[in-house]
Structures are given as C-alpha cells and as structure tokens.
Amino acid sequence: MARTTAINRYRNIGICAHVDAGKTTTTERILFYTGLSHKMGEVHDGAATTDWMVQEQERGITITSAAVTTFWKGSRGQYDNYRVNVIDTPGHVDFTIEVERSLRVLDGAVVVFCGTSGVEPQSETVWRQANKYGVPRVVYVNKMDRAGANFLRVVGQIKNRLGHTPVPVQLAIGAEDNFEGQVDLIKMKAIYWNDDDKGTTYREEEIPADMLDLANEWRSNMVEAAAEANEELMNKYLEEGDLTVEEIKAGLRARTLASEIVPAVCGSSFKNKGVPLVLDAVIDFLPAPTEIPAIKGIHPDLIEKPKDELVEADYDERHADDAEPFSALAFKIATDPFVGTLTFVRVYSGFLSSGDSVINSVKGKKERVGRMVQMHANQREEIKEVRAGDIAALIGMKDVTTGDTLCDLDKQIILERMDFPEPVISVAVEPKTKQDQEKMGIALGKLAQEDPSFRVKTDEETGQTIISGMGELHLDILVDRMKREFNVEANIGKPQVSYREKISKSNVEIEGKFVRQSGGRGQFGHCWIRFSEPDVDANGNITEGLVFTNEVVGGVVPKEYIPAIQKGIEEQMKNGVVAGYPLIGLKATVFDGSYHDVDSNEMAFKVAASMATKQLAQKGGGVVLEPIMKVEVVTPEDYMGDVMGDLNRRRGLIQGMDDSVSGKVIRAEVPLGEMFGYATDVRSMSQGRASYSMEFSKYAEAPSNIVEALVKKQG
C-alpha cells in the first residue's frame, strides 16, 4: 500500500503549556476543526469508528491523550491535505517525565500561554525541556477575552524571562470583553470570526484605522526578522523595503526551524476565535519529519559502553525515509480495558506491516506486531502499516517499556534513549485484603511499565512493597489509578526520602584483602584501590555511578580478575558505607595487588574489593546526601511573610522573588524531607489562595543531626 500523505506534509507536534493556560480547550478545538475538515471517505472501509468523547467519559483517563492523528487543509482550504499528529503533554511538574517523553518524539511544539498570567513558573520548565531537545516552537497566547489580557505584554515576558526572540505574526484587535479578532501582519488584513459556525470561518477586512500605525511598526519588525534568514532575502529587503507573503513565510520558517525565533499568534480558544490560524502557523512554520536532523543510535553490542566513551564512529543514523531499515521508539505504554496493552511508537525510518516481526534491540527480544491503530479526532482506526514519520499504537507487545527501540531484525540499532530522572520519594503500600495481594502485584507491574519514573521494589528486611516516584502527587495519582482501573485497595505508609551517600575525600588508597587458606582449596584476593569523590558540574549535579579504571601493570593482578574487582565495588556501592543508602557516584582505580596461583578466583577478588570499599566510611569521609527540591510558591502579597518564614523553618534557602499577576512568586531550594504535607500547610497559611510547584534540583550534604538519626535507624 502506497503512502497516502507525502512525508513533507506531515507535522508531528505537541501542545505544551502549564496548568491553566487553556491547553485542553485548545486541543479540543483543534480536534473539532480538523475533524470537520477530515473527509470521512478517507477512512479505510470497515475501520472501527468510536466517538472519542464517549470513550473519554467511560475511561476518565484518556487514551486519546497520547497521540491523535488529524488532517488539515488550511483555514481557507489553501493547502493540500496535511497530516498533523498531535501529542498531548501534561502541565503539572510531577509529570515532567511525561512532557520529556513527548518532546523527545515531537518535531515541533505549540506552546500555549495565558493572555493574563503570561509566563508562569511552570512554563519555564516546559520551555527549558523544549530547549534541551531543540524543538522548534510557535507561541499561542490564549484567553485574550479574559480581564487583564495583553498579547504584547506576554510577548515581552517571553523575550525577557525565557530569553527567546518571539516574532508576532498577528496583533489582537481589542482585548478582554472587546476582543474581536486578529490583525494578520503577513497579509495586512483584519480577521473577524463567524460565531454561527463556531469560528470555523472568518472574514477579512481592512485594518481598523486606529491600529494601522501599530500594525505597520510590528510588520516591519516581522519582515526584518524574516529577511535575516539568508543573504538573498536580506538584499531584497534592503533594496525594496519589503518582501512577498511567500518570502516572509519562508524566512520565518527557516529561522523557526533553526530555533532562532518563535512566531507568536493570539486568540481565544474558548470563544472560538483563532485556533484555525494556530493550525495554519503549524503548517507554515513547524518542520516536517524530513526537516529535522536524522536520529542517531548505536549498535546493540555497544549498550554497555558508557555514554561519554562513545565516539563518532559508534553512532549510526536513521533518516525519515521509507526505504531505510525500520526503526521506531516506544514513547508511551497505555493499558486499555478493551484491547490490552497499547504501545505508542514514533516511526523514524522504514515501514512496518501488521504481522511483521521486529526486534526490541534494548532487550534483545523478538516481537511480532499484531494489530496497529491510529487515534483520529472522532474515531479509532485499525491500520495495516506504518511508515517513517507516523505515530501509532501497536497492540499486544509483550515486553516493551517506555524508551525501548523497535527495529529491523537484520539492521539493528538502539535509538538515543530518554533520560529518566531517579525517583526522590518512596512510600510503603500494603494490600487491604488477601484478595488484593495478587492483584496489586499485577497492577503495580503494569503501572511501572507505563511510567519509567515510577519504581516498585520489595524491602528485603521488612518484606514490604515500596513504590517510588517524582513527588507526593505522582504517587497519589498512581495509588488512585490502582483503585480505579485495577480495583485494588491499598494502605499507604508515610513517605520516605531517597537519601544517597558519597565520599568527600580524593586519592584515598585502601587495601582490600580476603584470604581463607586452611588446607585444601582456599580463597585469595588482594587489591589496592585508589578512591576519589565523584565529579560535580557547574550546576551542582554529581556524576552518578562508578567511574572505574585499571592501572595494574606487570600482571600483579591477572586481567581476568579486574571485572570482579569492579563488581565488588559496585555491589558495595548499592549498600552504602555510612547509613546503608546507595553511593551516588564514585571514582575508583585499581593499581596494585597480588594473587595466588591456586587459591585466587573471581569471588575472592570481588569480596576483597567490597571490603576495601566498606572502609570508605572512615577513610573516605563518607557523607549522607539529601534530595533538594526547587520550590516556587505563588502567593498573594498579604501572606508573603508567613510563606517565607515557613520556608525558612523548613531549612529552605530563598533564591529570589518575582512579581506575577496572581501575586508574588517566591523561589527557594528546600530539602524534600521537610516538604511532606506542604500542599495542606501552604493552603491553610494563605486561606487557599497560594499555590506551589516543586521539582527535583540536586543532592546536597545532609546536616549532622539528620545523619545521626538515619544511622541510628539503620541500627
């Protein structure tokens, strides 16, 4: 079957925003307008169509949220049919992982801001993540009908607070109750929306006389920004003082794809004024899969090689081309009560038909692809194949987790994995009844498969099941989902902080010796190891894991025992050296030792290395680290003193303060151990008017009274 939409007419986009910018309404409107332009005849005969709104009401948790395929011909039918895959992203910081994983598979993003609140603390987090993945963006300033809305003020905030260059391609006509439409700066026309068809169509008129000067000023800014795309456009602009509509769009597009500028549009999704033009901006300014850099990957044989040791020759590339070997990234796993496990994948190269086999190159397991579906604005469609650039859900994959690569059996590759943060908070969960016991195991397994920032383990000493995640809200929602989706009732223990340890000295030389020789075959392992504290970057982040080097010369320790020494250090790192918490990072160099022809073996050297590592508590200056959270509280000014006093009592360090529409924004770094129950406390302090967000910042040394309590607890 041939491709129905040319790949240069694909757009894989995400709608990103913080909690109250009106993202859900905007996404719903996109589905509404694209659903209208999607001709039913294009759906393959016999496709199972179900109204997605009914499904959402049944579920509560949507499967449409992962990825929806829509079609768009332009607000005036000015384009060939474009295929727009919309990936939804949550706005809450406990779910930063969700945003990260969707940005990883997007080619472009629409970032929604509220016309009144503008740039809020959480919008900065989303923006930073989009920078990390180099995602080209279009800005949509929504809620222009709200009191205090001001498009150009928000544009100024994006420039000053986010450090990016926004280029308005529209201006708002009126604001608040009098918001009527937009000035299209590219065509220099005023746009007014028709209420009788819910803003599907609009009429173009001349720009109101009182706005002409402002429109001319912003248009010349925009044309100048477009002209800076290349020399040819710049020369024409300098000679003629203007560019054609096509040239303006081409110039802005080139600079948007290079992440030099972000085109900005405005509107009111709720009042049906402007969303079709947001979709036009997606087509005009955001990239097709062929316009983003080829995705890189490594061969499965190199999976154990540390990332910083990989050289250019180790990498392979996959281009957005049907003729290349198949490769895809699983970016979300969802459990659907009707069809079982849905694995959402982004196809980067090649094509795949249902019934084909692929290999999960991360786990080395072969999987047969049964059914495949795509979500549309108003139906779920069973499809027979996927091609480069597509986003679809595979049904019935057995052993795939988020971030795994699926690829061609003969041309294997592991695409760059997503970085998943380590959980910072843990709680014990216990099933309420015997019947819940087994169900809980299955439920937790499924939830962990869906969400890589959620971990499940059994405490060896107490036998309790411990779940870990990114914050209290994260774990609350997972426990709630266990109850709602899997019918499992569980009791939750008190939250526990994930402490870590490290050493504070460098170049500490320690001897590890394990000798058992009492007749017959004995044990003999002897090594000298030089330990140093891990490196720390400019932002205070510690290099995690073991950096191990071998400087043994002359064969005093045979080569085959070196991996055992490394393993011994790693195993002891998991158990810690001060209070039983894992060592976050460590540098170790084995440089000397001795062996016995008969009695030496791998086990003996492993034990010797482990014994040497244990001595770091005294000799290496072992310290306990606690997770420090970046906290932002938005509070009315009247409660500012109380909020700041409370943060100080929680050992918080105030980093700074800003003004926002809703009051003062207090930025602080606070140890996680002091933040339990903060949601309730901050509400009661401010009579329910303050709100806060919190994300992991770094690990830092814990004060001695806390360390003493932890050591005592370990007994």
Curated annotation (Swiss-Prot):
Record's keyword terms, sorted: Cytoplasm, Elongation factor, GTP-binding, Nucleotide-binding, Protein biosynthesis
SMART domains according to UniProt: EFG_C, EFG_IV
Residues annotated to bind GTP: 17-24, 88-92, 142-145
Superkingdom, natural source: Bacteria
GO function term, MF aspect, one: GTPase activity
CDD domains associated with the record: EF-G (cd01886), EFG_III (cd16262), EFG_mtEFG1_IV (cd01434), EFG_mtEFG_C (cd03713), EFG_mtEFG_II (cd04088)
Broad class of the protein's primary localization: cytoplasm
Residue stretches spanning the membrane: none
Entries under HAMAP family matching the protein: EF_G_EF_2_B
Function: Catalyzes the GTP-dependent ribosomal translocation step during translation elongation. During this step, the ribosome changes from the pre-translocational (PRE) to the post-translocational (POST) state as the newly formed A-site-bound peptidyl-tRNA and P-site-bound deacylated tRNA move to the P and E sites, respectively. Catalyzes the coordinated movement of the two tRNA molecules, the mRNA and conformational changes in the ribosome.
Protein name per Swiss-Prot or TrEMBL: Elongation factor G
Organism per entry: Pseudomonas fluorescens (strain ATCC BAA-477 / NRRL B-23932 / Pf-5)
